[in-house]
Curated annotation (Swiss-Prot):
<dbReference type="GO" id="GO:0004691">
    <property type="term" value="F:cAMP-dependent protein kinase activity"/>
</dbReference>
<dbReference type="GO" id="GO:0046777">
    <property type="term" value="P:protein autophosphorylation"/>
</dbReference>
<keyword id="KW-0597">Phosphoprotein</keyword>
<dbReference type="GO" id="GO:0005634">
    <property type="term" value="C:nucleus"/>
</dbReference>
<keyword id="KW-0418">Kinase</keyword>
<keyword id="KW-0114">cAMP</keyword>
<dbReference type="GO" id="GO:0018105">
    <property type="term" value="P:peptidyl-serine phosphorylation"/>
</dbReference>
<feature type="binding site">
    <location>
        <position position="75"/>
    </location>
    <ligand>
        <name>ATP</name>
    </ligand>
</feature>
<keyword id="KW-0007">Acetylation</keyword>
<keyword id="KW-0539">Nucleus</keyword>
<feature type="region of interest" description="Disordered">
    <location>
        <begin position="316"/>
        <end position="355"/>
    </location>
</feature>
<dbReference type="GO" id="GO:0060993">
    <property type="term" value="P:kidney morphogenesis"/>
</dbReference>
<dbReference type="GO" id="GO:0007155">
    <property type="term" value="P:cell adhesion"/>
</dbReference>
<dbReference type="GO" id="GO:2000696">
    <property type="term" value="P:regulation of epithelial cell differentiation involved in kidney development"/>
</dbReference>
<dbReference type="GO" id="GO:0001525">
    <property type="term" value="P:angiogenesis"/>
</dbReference>
<keyword id="KW-0808">Transferase</keyword>
<dbReference type="GO" id="GO:0060562">
    <property type="term" value="P:epithelial tube morphogenesis"/>
</dbReference>
Amino acid sequence: MEPPAGAAATVKDPDHDPVKTKVSAPAADPKPRTSSQKAGHSLQDWDTIATVGTGTFGRVNLVKEKTGRQYCALKIMSIPDVIRLKQEQHVQNEKAVLKEINHPFLIKLLWTGHDNRFLYMLMEFVPGGELFTYLRNRGRFSSVASVFYATEIVCAIEYLHSKEIVYRDLKPENILLDREGHIKLTDFGFAKKLVDRTWTLCGTPEYLAPEVIQSKGHGRAVDWWALGILIFEMLSGFPPFFDDNPFGIYQKILACKIDFPRQLDFTSKDLIKKLLVVDRTRRLGNMKNGAEDIKRHRWFRGVEWESVPQRKLKPPIVPKLSGDGDISNFETYPESELDKTPSVSDKDLETFKNF
């Protein structure tokens, strides 16, 4: 089986010297409105150091406390773009979910606010960079490394599900490594509190579960499907279903014909097959015993699950860092053009009055 074109694309080497680029922050409202104001958390208290991530309607900046030594990540979202792309509910969902969760493997939200152009979310800075970068630089992970990351992810997803939250965007790009090498799930824009099944088509094509594609309504089971895709990708270096266009990917997902690379052993393949079951009622993790069925699978043999959330397992990769504000494990980005973002009317701003 050949990986998709570009699967081993060159990405930034995490071992080079940290970038010291100084970028300008957007010219914000001098008195941004905040809905979760805490002492020491306002835009005026932070200096922007560099951009460490970009998205469809904003970016994430590394910021440093002016009067102290704390570094944080500031997510800045353009309100006009959020409105244009009809992402208001996703943004509100992200804030609501982040306010509710507290887990060692999930990113922490510290503060939110807005002015008449931007929404702001101040979060802990996780300096190790994306798991995606390490996976692409190495080609694929060993079985030992894959078990470690899957173990911490299972605990994180199980916790979210216990809170009636479905994550819906599990992929290597959304898994950060902290300074010790433990994971932090980030980007909760697609996360949703479950009251009943949901029908929204969202997520990354290669990781979408069949029931999402078929608009049958979906719940927790989509996260366990994505875990199966992730385990396959960690062990092989590429996802099991790929094509030049999303519709081709969707067709392959629905057919669910998995071509396993030769290096995958029987136990790995058995777990992946049980996670990548089109019928969600038979999918591992979504049956009567829930996540316990996954934990008991022999691929995880030897894992002391009670020690996992205590961060007692030894990480296979420890990020190289020169200091607290080291951004060498992240891509470099061009200087921000956020100052060109127009302001919005009071009517449009009403949607975000409690943000």
